[in-house]
Amino acid sequence: MALYDEDLLKNPFYLALQKWRPDLCSKVAQIHGIVLVPCKGSLSSSIQSTCQFESYILIPVEEHFQTLNGKDVFIQGNRIKLGAGFTCLLSVPILFEETFYNEKEESFSILCIAHPLEKRESSEEPLAPSDPFSLKTIEDVREFLGRHSERFDRNIASFHRTFRECERKSLRHHIDSANALYTKCLQQLLRDSHLKMLAKQEAQMNLMKQAVEIYVHHEIYDLIFKYVGTMEASEDAAFNKITRSLQDLQQKDIGVKPEFSFNIPRAKRELAQLNKCTSPQQKLVCLRKVVQLITQSPSQRVNLETMCADDLLSVLLYLLVKTEIPNWMANLSYIKNFRFSSSAKDELGYCLTSFEAAIEYIRQGSLSAKPPESEGFGDRLFLKQRMSLLSQMTSSPTDCLFKHIASGNQKEVERLLSQEDHDKDAVQKMCHPLCFCDDCEKLVSGRLNDPSVVTPFSRDDRGHTPLHVAALCGQASLIDLLVSKGAVVNATDYHGATPLHLACQKGYQSVTLLLLHYKASAEVQDNNGNTPLHLACTYGHEDCVKALVYYDVESCRLDIGNEKGDTPLHIAARWGYQAIIETLLQNGASPEIQNRLKETPLKCALNSKILSVMEAYHLSFERRQKSSEAPVQSLQRSVDSISQESSTSSFSSMSAGSRQEETKKDYREVEKLLRAVADGDLEMVRYLLEWTEEDLEDAEDTVSAVDPEFCHPLCQCPKCAPAQKRLAKVPASGLGVNVTSQDGSSPLYVAALHGRADLIPLLLKHGANAGARNADQAVPLHLACQQGHFQVVKCLLDSNAKPNKKDLSGNTPLIYACSGGHHEVVALLLQHGAAINTSNNKGNTALHEAVIEKHVFVVELLLLHGASVQVLNKRQRTAVDCAEQNSKIMELLQVVPSCVASLDDVAETDRKEYVTVKIRKKWNSKLYDLPDEPFTRQFYFAHSAGQFKGKTSREIMARDRSVPNLTEGSLHEPGRQSVTLRQNNLPAQSGSHAAEKGNSDWPERPRVTQTGPGHRRMLRRHTVEDAVVSQGPEAAGPLSTPQEVSASRS
């Protein structure tokens, strides 16, 4: 409702009410009623004591209100509806509401309304309803601005001094300069706390913009308008020549209707005031008043819609010819190019379009003194078409530029901005910069007054520069172009926001990093006291928070408060952004600072989880304060492990104090990089390591970074040069791809630990050492296997990482994978030749660890690949000794080794195919998403009472039919017959069968007859591979019933 504001204590109507009827003031306070007060601008004359003040005092009754003299009034939304008792049932807008108290602390409300309740019929009243949202005179502006105008005067004085030096610059330069002055003054005005609150309402913001524009232009009018007049002098002379030749033109010659002739003298007098107006806004108001006068009839006011476009344009044509204004072109140029407070789409813009169309019609020579019958209407049609075209052309050159920036059209943006370069080329061709000879005048005359030229300093009606728009729309590719063209990185809009503010508000990390690279200040506060970090925390953009903090913690000012005293940590805690809170606390944000409500970030946390995180850091913060020297000592101890690229000699030459500072700085930079890798923040990693787009595009062309082979260490031949360049490249920040932290962790190590499969190829491509060890002598492959990150393990192995390296505990990657139960990783390691029976410092093999951790599938996989069950650890225990009795693992340890041993005489290739056919393609399958079936092959044990003499078990190995059998043997054999082999004659049959197929590439599986359904229980599953039924070990002697090994092909 509060779209308009004024001091009601100075309102003439309210003052008259207090003066003439104090009894009504007392009564309305006693009954807590409502007083209706017309706004100041709607009161045409002094208020008389005979005014019916009772009609403006409202008393609530049931569902409506009554005045003190018994008239009905309804309040519906933001309008007053007059009811019974009033002669005219008007609807009056409510502008705002205030509550007043008298000396007895009795309250009553005042509703400021747009105009009085009585209908006005006198033609002497204002021509249109008073617009409370516009300022008309410089006196109104000075009253509105108050003391703020004194601050503007200093900026204006500076503008006067610099204008003389740039007088020969182009029109666009002066447009941008005047706009910059306007923006600076508006920013100063919006720093006022009261006006800042009002500015949140669009109408109030427009009022402030009008006030600043009128005041600024009034003070620089002589400079700017004189310059524009000089630029448009030749155009004005040509137009004046035409209008002078039409002085005999009569109204009837151009079809002016008689009903509109009456107001032409008044409109002519009003139009003559145009050159007395000192701002575009005032000139437009003058033109609007002319149009209103034209449309007013002698008896009553009529709306603009009652006059058609032809009627209006006929009158305007007559006024343009008959009014003595010699500089119409200068006025048009001034109004169009120096109006900053609003767009051309409002009522004032329509009035300007009408005059512009009429002027263009006259310039074309279409107007003559002939009667309309002989003139023809072809030219009139042109007039209407021109007016329609002008009304549609609402986009200024600046608007066009901003649209192309928003859409990322780099080619068009570059074309528009390169127009200014032509002006510079023209100046270079002049005799000298101040030359006025004919040749030099021809060079510059066509470009100096061209308003279509745009620059990186052009602004829209929000105060945004092109760089603001690029940041707001996330167009990182245009940041470089705009900065190279001279865009001001720290330019501020009307609300004090820089491009960095907008990028952080919208969450564009790449834009944020680019702006920081071009020295954008992270310390700038907008009108609300917010830094870019405040906005990134408010909107929860973790990536932007990290970009600001990691770039430079000191310049980011983590503990600065906004106008409410809130630090970024207050905001992140209030909205529950845990990751942002941790980032801020890790980099030194204080949890002790209080805002203006005496709240610490801890008190702002409304979430119990966030509160626990804050409290944990709060306790550590207190401990750090008590022992502040500990971190420095720790850093000093690890000076040599912070960066592989550091220079030992430079550190040794420093003093102890400077060494600690350098160590602290290097450590912080490394931690930034490692945290970005841990978070998978590719943009931040790229920025810190200074990778380019080409580096990412070539990511798939990763070469091995493990011991690259060169012709000689310094070889630069075509084969060695790419790898040499990659290994030698170190960013200017000193951060290399193999830099390490205190504990020896490198970026590749952290990426492997956190499973960042997208970063691993990039790190390896840029020279990361896959064989580098940390403080525990572990390589990245150890960590990836321990955490079960299959894709990371695959990438490292494909880059020739060694699968059998041991750490300080003697553990290999295979032992870690088996201990964690990561059967997919185990299969992959075995395929790459991992040693299966290697022991760690405790003597445990991979099989020991899998048995101890009870990972059934891993145990089966190891056994099928020949893991020994006889190896003793340092406690003299085998894997069988570590297994629980009567468990599935125990049955596996007893059954599978004998089954595998029975196949020892089979050809090696066939045996591998037989037991690992499913494992080979594990990493290429996407069918293992179900949590209850993590690996394709599962074992089921079914006990049969009639087939075994002793305690035996039967194992059925079922496989998923949806996974194709892609072994090399299966590709050559379109159909494989089911075979059956008895255990007692397996070697002999295998040998004879191999002899028969001596010329075959792949020996066939020993033939085994498949048992019928009545002889065994088979768990039904879709299968592609062979199902193996193995016999358990014989404890007391040979089994009475031979155990059959059967393979079924589905």
UniProtKB/Swiss-Prot annotation:
Residue numbers spanned by region Disordered: 630-665, 987-1050
GO BP annotation list: early endosome to late endosome transport; neuron projection morphogenesis; protein transport
Keyword presence, Cell membrane: yes
Residue stretches of biased makeup (Polar residues): 1040-1050
Span list, region Interaction with RAB38: 451-600
ANK repeat positions: 396-426, 462-491, 495-524, 528-560, 564-593, 597-627, 668-698, 743-772, 776-805, 809-838, 842-871
Region Sufficient for GEF activity towards RAB21, annotated ranges: 1-372
Compositional bias of kind Low complexity: 638-658
Metal-binding recorded as keyword: no
Localization of this protein: Early endosome; Late endosome; Cytoplasmic vesicle membrane; Lysosome
Residues modified as Phosphoserine: 962, 970
Major subcellular site: other
Assembly information from the UniProt record: Interacts with RAB21 (GDP-bound form), VPS29, KIF5A, KIF5C, GOLGA4. Interacts with RAB32 (GTP-bound form), RAB38 (GTP-bound form), VAMP7. Interacts with low affinity with RAB5. ANKRD27:RAB32 heterodimers can homodimerize to form tetramers. Can interact with RAB38 or RAB32, VPS29 and VAMP7 simultaneously. A decreased interaction with RAB32 seen in the presence of SGSM2.
Protein name as annotated: Ankyrin repeat domain-containing protein 27
Species this protein is from: Pongo abelii
Designated gene of the protein: ANKRD27
